[in-house]
């Protein structure tokens, strides 16, 4: 329900920040990497947010990009992965390296994140690869209405573009990655994997 | 609890929009038809809303008119119909065609909406017709206090006017529809049906 | 959690109003008598509120005075009385006549409210009388810190004053009612009953 | 989720205050000692807050310092201690005397708080001492990123500094207390205990 907060940064803690919006201070759980990258308290900040609703708690989680938030939400969909663990994965690995690891089926790198054992790493691997495929099928049915992305290129490229956007990449990031592919004679899945590999290595 | 949002349109997705109100971005689920009809991001928009509260989620659904929201709420009252399916019905058919279909007992048109099979279509048909009748009985007991609608015309017309208003039509829409009826020697139910048919064919 | 709303009155329905505060429209359930007493849409209104939290709904109830809200909250504490019924009692009888009825043990008047049968009326009678007594015991232990009410008069009068304030009367209303009592040689309970009778007959 | 409220003080009750922020009045449960210490209604106030979420209630609790709120949250973690009892402990004893009592294992002073019997006092004692130790272990792993505290002094002092800050003391309070210790040749736990004793006696 709450998509973002834009307000005055008031306090920075190791794993949370407080942002004031209109006289109300919102405590937002963030990865330590994001907390360390924020400006000095007093400056205006913009955080993409996810509102976690439980029977006995309302908690807000914050991200610097839609890309990170989308990865967080996909991780939340994996059985046994709660918001804090999902936040740790996004915070420690960063989304680009996460997708690159998923493509390489590199469970090892996932287990470097506190709270992720071999079993959870495998489950993340299986479910996120599956979602990656599904993401393309769902997306190809409804090409994005936003940002007037030109639907001129071939069907596979457009599907790949839509899939990358629905993973949280901006249209510009997605288009640039696709344009840098040496071989574009691939199906949508192949284009997405190749683009993710390129962005994962940046 | 939250009846509407008035703020800056920030992002448009295929099935959701983000509206900023006072530094907070609210993500609102909307039918694709509404998403496509909104102005450019940056403009001010007004959405009638419904706040769905569940044990693990707070979700906001948005509408361009009280008419659509009222239909959505009545659909929500039908067993087995959740917010997303109700939104799909309102988005795909539009409220006028929905009421016209209910009057014609046309379950076929309901099944064109993804997520609605024959069984759900029949249940919607039965329950919404029943509600339509009840709507009139309840409404006739308490004529609307809003908009100073002149209670001069006959009792049946006033009941029909109140029923149409409680279905979400504005007083002006309801009065115009009743005034265009060739035969006004009907009881309240008859007047309502005839008016809905006229508005359903527009 | 939400004690009041102060904003622009946008819409008035038979049993609810919509108040805009900072770009958000809040739908507030109110008694018809309050809806009918509000100014024209567009004016600024102030409503004391109660936020009802349930597993599948957040609903706001509105009152024109703390007195009405306090009575509503005490009614909510009676087994089997939900917010809508409590609102109907406060709306139909008004708090002063409610307390006068409780003192006279007049269950008949309670049954004139839709949704209140003889059994519920008796339960309301018993529980509110009991609360009335408890209210005084609790209150007498902690005299109000607000409004600098002079604690010069006798102990019984101060206890009665505190009890009336905790029932939602303003300090001025409570003091005036006590000052109009012909016989003030009563204990706190007697003073409260007598004052309620006077205010109930206004 | 809601870290603080900054707004106009509207009403003061024995155990709650109402603060207006942007047209909405928020009712905040506070200890009587805090209610009595607030300025006149109409002035701007700042309260650190805790939003308690239950299936049938959203309640806000308020504090004048992070120190008090941190103690409140640690008390909430003790089995059988709810928000009102935790608020009563913080309100009656004050956080400094609470920590001093925990260090002295003085359960007697805890039982002076309404709602705290010998059994709860013992449980608070055991669990808060345990948390105190844990607090240091957890904290020493992630030295605070806030307020650029110079990490020049010895490792034990920095761990003690971080532990005191995570208990809610400001960096300045923590550093001053450590600087006043006659004997600083202690491990982190010893430094923390000594500092708490000094601050507890102020």
From Swiss-Prot, chains A, B, C, D:
Residues 152-202 are annotated as: Domain III. SUPFAM superfamilies: DNA helicase RuvA subunit, C-terminal domain, Nucleic acid-binding proteins, RuvA domain 2-like. CDD domains: UBA_RuvA_C. Residues 144-152 are annotated as: Flexible linker. GO terms for cellular component: cytoplasm; Holliday junction helicase complex; Holliday junction resolvase complex. Keywords: Cytoplasm, DNA damage, DNA recombination, DNA repair, DNA-binding. Its main location: cytoplasm. Residues 65-143 are annotated as: Domain II. Homotetramer. Forms an RuvA(8)-RuvB(12)-Holliday junction (HJ) complex. HJ DNA is sandwiched between 2 RuvA tetramers; dsDNA enters through RuvA and exits via RuvB. An RuvB hexamer assembles on each DNA strand where it exits the tetramer. Each RuvB hexamer is contacted by two RuvA subunits (via domain III) on 2 adjacent RuvB subunits; this complex drives branch migration. In the full resolvosome a probable DNA-RuvA(4)-RuvB(12)-RuvC(2) complex forms which resolves the HJ. The RuvA-RuvB-RuvC complex processes Holliday junction (HJ) DNA during genetic recombination and DNA repair, while the RuvA-RuvB complex plays an important role in the rescue of blocked DNA replication forks via replication fork reversal (RFR). RuvA specifically binds to HJ cruciform DNA, conferring on it an open structure. The RuvB hexamer acts as an ATP-dependent pump, pulling dsDNA into and through the RuvAB complex. HJ branch migration allows RuvC to scan DNA until it finds its consensus sequence, where it cleaves and resolves the cruciform DNA. This is Holliday junction branch migration complex subunit RuvA. It comes from Desulforudis audaxviator (strain MP104C). The lineage of its organism: Bacteria, Bacillati, Bacillota, Clostridia, Thermoanaerobacterales.
